[in-house]
Every structure is written in structure tokens, then in C-alpha cells.
């Protein structure tokens, strides 16, 4: 009788683990640690969102091609052609100064060009953001500058071919941007961007053609 009373007890220990989770022993051992990490991230996120500047952004912009480099455009020398771009852009803040209104971001874009030629462009560049303008209490204004990046197009644009017909799909990506927002809604920006591909003074090629340039207007949500 004593033996019979103890016989059923081994059964729950043999069958219990299978219906309870079905996970391998390794995952069962690691699950508590993973849960703690995820919980910590969730608890920390609201603090970062409230107590710090936004570090991420998503945006969209559209632009039209002009036939001069950014310097000539700023001097008023530009002719616009029937070549357009629609693009998605995203950025992440990598560093923020503790004493100056200055931060470093990594900015990426993917866009589709259409009009005289149809092609896709992907580009990425480190970008400096300056937010120290004296009128920012009235209109938040940020200057973003990215002189050195990488731009790749799915095909060589006819607007970038030299006299011999050659061109490069990979060129330097340069961007110059002014972003505007209301002081109480700095997470929503309207921006004007000069989007430029170049050879860095014939360093990347010497085909004798200027890279594409677009004057673009866009909207960005920072979070």
C-alpha cells in the first residue's frame, strides 16, 4: 500500500514540462534574463522620450533637378529640368554636445527619380545639426550639413554622363538643409534640402560631368 501511494508521483515530473512551454531547456534558462532586459528597455523608453531630445526621425521629400552645384544655386544660377525625385529619409542621432546646440546624426535616404530618366537612388551620410539660432523661441530653425557621404544609383543617369558617355553609379552624397518647426512642436519639421551627387572635384572620376542636384521640400517626424 505504501508503494502504491507513491507510484503516481513520478508521472507529473515526467509529463509536466512538455505541456507547460514546449521550449528547449536553453530557452527556458534564458527566458528570465531576456524578460528582464526587455522590461528594462520598456521602462527606460518613456524617460528618454520625455527627458531628452528625439534621437530618431522619419521623413519624406520631393524635389526637382537643377543643373548647377549647390554653390552656384545659392548664387541664383540654376536652370530646372523635367527630372523629379520622391524619397524617404531616416536619421539617428549619434552624438550630442553638452555645451553647444550641436549634434551628429547619420542620415539615409532611398528615392525614385522620374521624368527624363527613371532610376533609384540610395544614399547615406553623417550630418551635423546646428540648432543655435537666436530666433528659435519664435521659429525653431535647424541647419543640417552633410558634406561627405555615399550615393548609389541603379543606373547611370543621362544627366551625369560626360562627353564620352561615361558616368558613375557611385558618387559622393552631399546635403545641405534648413529645417523649421514650432518651438512647442519641435518633433514635426518642414525642411528644404539641397540634394547633391558629386565626384569631389574629379576625385571619384574624371568623366567631365556634374552629379545630379535637386532642390527638395519635405516633412519629418522626430521621435
Residue locations for each model-derived region?
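Generic alpha-helical scaffold signal
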Residues: 80-84, 98-100, 118-122
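A glycine-rich, hydrophobic loop/mini-helix early in the fold
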Residues: 89-107
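Contiguous hydrophobic segments
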Residues: 64-70, 75-87, 103, 157-180
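Outer-membrane beta-barrel transmembrane domain signature
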Residues: 94-96, 109-215, 220-223
Amino acid at each position: 500500500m505504501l508503494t502504491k501511494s507513491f507510484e503516481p508521483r513520478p508521472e507529473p515530473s515526467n509529463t509536466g514540462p512538455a505541456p507547460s512551454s514546449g521550449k528547449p531547456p536553453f530557452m527556458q534558462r534564458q527566458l528570465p534574463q531576456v524578460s528582464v532586459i526587455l522590461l528594462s528597455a520598456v521602462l527606460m523608453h518613456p524617460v528618454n522620450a520625455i527627458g531628452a531630445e528625439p534621437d530618431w526621425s522619419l521623413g519624406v521629400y520631393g524635389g526637382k533637378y537643377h543643373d548647377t552645384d549647390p554653390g552656384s544655386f545659392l548664387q541664383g544660377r540654376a536652370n530646372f529640368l523635367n527630372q523629379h525625385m520622391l524619397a524617404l529619409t531616416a536619421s539617428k542621432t549619434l552624438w550630442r554636445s553638452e555645451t553647444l546646440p550641436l549634434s551628429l546624426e547619420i542620415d539615409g535616404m532611398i528615392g525614385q527619380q522620374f521624368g527624363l530618366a527613371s532610376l533609384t537612388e540610395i544614399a547615406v551620410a553623417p550630418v551635423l545639426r546646428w540648432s543655435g539660432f537666436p530666433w528659435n523661441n519664435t521659429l525653431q530653425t535647424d541647419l543640417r550639413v552633410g558634406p561627405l557621404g555615399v550615393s548609389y544609383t541603379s543606373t547611370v543617369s543621362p544627366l551625369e554622363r560626360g562627353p564620352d558617355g561615361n558616368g558613375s553609379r557611385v558618387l559622393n552624397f552631399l546635403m545641405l538643409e534648413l529645417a523649421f518647426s514650432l518651438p512647442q512642436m519641435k518633433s514635426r519639421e518642414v525642411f528644404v534640402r539641397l540634394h547633391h551627387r558629386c565626384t569631389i572635384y574629379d576625385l571619384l572620376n574624371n568623366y567631365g560631368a556634374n552629379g545630379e542636384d535637386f532642390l527638395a521640400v519635405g516633412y519629418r517626424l522626430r521621435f
